Amino acid sequence: MAKEQQVQANDLQEKLIAVNRVSKTVKGGRIMSFTALTVVGDGNGRVGFGYGKAREVPAAIQKAMEKARRNMVTIALNEGTLHHPVKGRHSGSKVYMQPAAEGTGVIAGGAMRAVLEVAGVHNVLSKAYGSTNPINIVRATIDALVDVKSPEMVAAKRGLTVEAISE
């Protein structure tokens, strides 16, 4: 449910995934506040998410965007898709993603779609299992994307050439 997208001067795409009103009950009544979940990416393999809380919606969104910019990770992409199928989990949410052919598009729902789009993934097949809580789905998706290894990374780790491991 990506509701809003902006492009900053430093070419970061920002998406607002969810805004939630929460309340704290005190002796005098309820204190309302808001939470915002956002993702930020450069469209070329860098992505981060942020979760902000404040008494007003704009302040919560601004805090979430700042946290997202500070918590960016780099993922290995293969011409707009993934190098290999990958699974991720966080809490009760599980996600599965696999590379797709050119022209397939982003087959993903809700929060996972927002993360993949700002990360620069253009062709992917994905499925979310278990809890569909947006925060857990975003964390599981980013965990899975961080686990993607390029052939160059695998070759370097094994001390072989790329040609040797691709056989």
UniProtKB/Swiss-Prot annotation:
Keywords: Ribonucleoprotein, Ribosomal protein, RNA-binding, rRNA-binding. The keyword RNA-binding applies. One of its GO terms (molecular function) is rRNA binding. It comes from the Bacteria. Gene3D superfamilies: 3.30.160.20, 3.30.230.10. InterPro entries: Ribosomal_Su5_D2-typ_SF (IPR020568), Ribosomal_uS5 (IPR000851), Ribosomal_uS5_bac-type (IPR005712), Ribosomal_uS5_C (IPR005324), Ribosomal_uS5_N (IPR013810), Ribosomal_uS5_N_CS (IPR018192), Ribsml_uS5_D2-typ_fold_subgr (IPR014721). GO terms for biological process: translation. GO terms for cellular component: small ribosomal subunit. Residues 12-75 form the S5 DRBM domain. The N-terminal domain interacts with the head of the 30S subunit; the C-terminal domain interacts with the body and contacts protein S4. The interaction surface between S4 and S5 is involved in control of translational fidelity. Part of the 30S ribosomal subunit. Contacts proteins S4 and S8. With S4 and S12 plays an important role in translational accuracy. Located at the back of the 30S subunit body where it stabilizes the conformation of the head with respect to the body. Belongs to the universal ribosomal protein uS5 family. This is Small ribosomal subunit protein uS5. It comes from Vibrio vulnificus (strain YJ016).
